[in-house]
């Protein structure tokens, strides 16, 4: 046996083992198989813009739908010459159906109203025997002063309750419309929150803020700034009903119709 040759062979073997160990350490350091991957909750909660969204299905309604319109004073018909001239009532003719109007003045997801509690309690009190084809949940600017804390949780709970009560109904969220211009920061925050939450569920969201329903050019035609205390006027309610009907038609790809045939609407 040649002792020099044996030492050389042992040295080469040691170098080979060392190289393998170094490579393994590098691979494991990069791969880190023991570290858990990011959870879906963490990814979704990383930021509004990064949240996972679900594409809504086209809105499909029967020829003569029953529509539950649920919201605040705008849904109630405040500042119209008669509450029944409010947008939620006028919508019935525009969709060739029937509307069930449930509006409580001053109410929101967090804020109790003048005539009833906040949205969550009101949803719990709805008649489970109703069979709406479509539910429109409107608003609300009434939550502006309540702040962001707990807002998304209240919205989620209310929407969960509505969907559980009427599982066969399609649900469309109608965001807050500005009662004054420029649009306030709190109203804009509510609009963003509702849009993100609706997108995460695959629900349609209609944003009067983003779509410019109320502008400096038509503001005084739509909003009664005197006796109406910055609520839609009678003409304003008609205008809002037409904008909503057109938006709903777009969600289903149907032709857009205008209310009242030759009736004029406030300038846009």
Named regions from a protein language model:
Residues 123, 155-160, 191:
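Generic structural signal for well-ordered alpha-helices
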Residues 1-70, 74-81, 93, 245-268:
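N-terminal secretory targeting modules
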Residues 61, 65, 81-86, 146-153, ...:
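Soluble non-cytosolic domains of exported or imported proteins
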Residues 103, 175, 207-209:
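Residue-level recognition of beta-strand->loop/alpha-helix junctions
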Residues 180-268:
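Catalytic His-Asp segment of secreted/periplasmic serine-dependent ester chemistry enzymes
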Residues 13-29, 97, 127, 134, ...:
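Hydrophobic alpha-helical membrane segments, chiefly transmembrane helices and signal peptide h-regions
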Residues 138-142, 161-192:
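Active-site segments of SGNH/GDSL-like serine hydrolases
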């Amino acid at each position: 046996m040649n002792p020099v040759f044996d030492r050389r062979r042992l040295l080469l073997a040691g170098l080979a083992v060392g190289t393998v160990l170094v490579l393994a350490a590098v691979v494991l350091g990069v791969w880190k198989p023991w570290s858990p991957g990011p959870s879906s909750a963490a990814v979704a909660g990383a930021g509004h813009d990064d949240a996972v969204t679900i594409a809504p299905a086209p809105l499909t309604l029967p020829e003569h739908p029953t529509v539950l319109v649920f919201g605040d004073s705008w849904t109630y018909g405040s500042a119209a010459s008669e509450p029944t001239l409010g947008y939620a009532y006028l919508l019935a003719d525009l969709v060739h159906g029937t509307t069930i109007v449930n509006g409580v003045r001053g109410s929101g997801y967090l804020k109790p109203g003048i005539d009833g509690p906040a949205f969550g309690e009101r949803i719990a009190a709805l008649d489970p025997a109703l069979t709406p084809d479509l539910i429109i949940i409107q608003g609300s600017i009434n939550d502006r002063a309540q702040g962001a804390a707990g807002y998304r949780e209240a919205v989620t709970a209310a929407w969960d309750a509505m969907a559980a009560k009427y599982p066969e109904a399609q649900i469309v969220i109608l965001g807050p419309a500005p009662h004054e211009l420029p649009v306030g920061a709190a109203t804009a925050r509510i609009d963003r929150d509702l849009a993100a939450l609706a997108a995460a569920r695959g629900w349609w969201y209609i944003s009067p803020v983003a779509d410019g329903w109320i502008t400096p050019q038509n503001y005084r035609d739509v909003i009664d700034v005197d006796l109406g205390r910055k609520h839609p006027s009678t003409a304003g309610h008609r205008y809002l009903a037409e904008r909503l009907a057109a938006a709903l038609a777009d969600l289903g790809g149907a032709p857009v119709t205008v209310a009242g045939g030759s009736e004029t609407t406030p300038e846009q």
